[in-house]
From Swiss-Prot:
This is Olfactory receptor 1D4. One of its GO terms (biological process) is G protein-coupled receptor signaling pathway. Odorant receptor. GO terms for molecular function: G protein-coupled receptor activity; olfactory receptor activity. Residues 50-57, 121-140, 221-237, 292-311 are cytoplasmic. Keywords: Cell membrane, Disulfide bond, G-protein coupled receptor, Glycoprotein, Membrane, Olfaction, Receptor, Sensory transduction, Transducer, Transmembrane, Transmembrane helix. It comes from Homo sapiens (Human). Belongs to the G-protein coupled receptor 1 family. Glycans are attached at N5.
Length: 311
């Protein structure tokens, strides 16, 4: 069966990272808790930014979209994971697996692009403050976000289309949490050299280019901060970047743990690293921004308690 006639009835088995019923119950409650915390945290960030006029700035516009992306990202994978923990039927259809993979690739790429745009926003705000209003106009912000969405959608479609050219035969058992590109290539019985080369080439180009852009931006930001005469001003300026820098470090650190390795060395032990980038990073982002950013201090809490306040 080739990529053209993978039947709609074909399916994969998402066996997860443990087949022990006791461990699956523990994993169920752990992932359910993490999912609820992630949803609550990111929804509160979005509501706080949309309801507070003081936060209607380019930086928080992109932060709200980053939270939306993280919310969509965990919803793409965790609900199916939770169902599998509680069910004997762990099957996922071929189309369902490709759909999950498409959104996974697109949303990881979108996260990366938004983080790069946020780095540019901080660079303009700190290194070119007199031009900030014109350089980060509302129209340009919408255009940049549209480009981020467009590129991520196209990249997801490209890799998903290439995967439809791959043949799967024999046991389609995925000892993993969700349909991941590396795992599916690992299960393939046809030649995956072309798609693997395309995955490495495009992935390195996109992610390393944007990482290089962010690194260059922060080098210039740090240089500008060091030239400031006042220590208090240096601290205040750097604190506006600390949250973003923390999120970037967490995002790239966990992503590198999973994907910066040859395909033949990829094994199920990488599930721990996958949990970190697929679940822990979206969960931690709201806390990082809320705790490290002065403008966001208490903002999610105010949204949460607003219905209980007297008019």
């Amino acid at each position: 069966m080739d990529g053209d006639n993978q039947s709609e009835n074909s399916q994969f088995l998402l066996l997860g990272i443990s087949e022990s019923p006791e461990q699956q119950q523990i994993l169920f409650w752990m992932f359910l808790s993490m999912y609820l915390v992630t949803v609550l945290g990111n929804v509160l960030i979005i509501l706080a930014i949309s309801s507070d006029s003081h936060l209607h700035t380019p930086m928080y516009f992109f932060l709200a979209n980053l939270s939306f992306t993280d919310l969509f990202f965990v919803t793409n994978t965790i609900p199916k994971m939770l169902v599998n923990f509680q069910s004997q039927n762990k099957a996922i259809s071929y189309a369902g697996c490709l759909t999950q993979l498409y959104f996974l690739v697109s949303l990881v790429t979108l996260d990366n692009l938004i983080l790069a745009v946020m780095a540019y926003d901080r660079y303009v705000a700190i290194c070119c403050p007199l031009h900030y209003v014109t350089a980060m106009s509302p129209g340009l912000c919408v255009l940049l976000l549209s480009l981020c969405w467009g590129l991520s959608v196209l990249y997801g479609l490209l890799l998903t289309f290439l995967l439809t050219r791959v043949t799967f035969c024999g046991p389609r058992e995925i000892h993993y949490l969700f349909c991941d590109m590396y795992i599916l290539l690992w299960l393939a019985c046809s030649n995956t050299h072309i798609i693997h080369t395309a995955l490495i080439a495009t992935g390195c180009f996109i992610f390393l280019t944007l990482l290089g852009f962010m690194t260059t931006s922060y080098v210039r930001i740090v240089r500008t901060i060091l030239q400031m005469p006042s220590a208090s001003k240096k601290y205040k300026t750097f604190s506006t970047c600390a949250s973003h820098l923390g999120v970037v470090s967490l995002f790239y650190g966990t992503l590198a743990m999973v994907y910066l390795q040859p395909l033949h060395t990829y094994s199920m032990k990488d599930s721990v690293a996958t949990v970190m980038y697929a679940v822990l990073t979206p969960m931690m982002n709201p806390f990082i921004y809320s705790l490290r950013n002065k403008d966001m201090h208490g903002a999610p809490g105010r949204v949460l308690w607003r219905p209980f306040q007297r008019p």
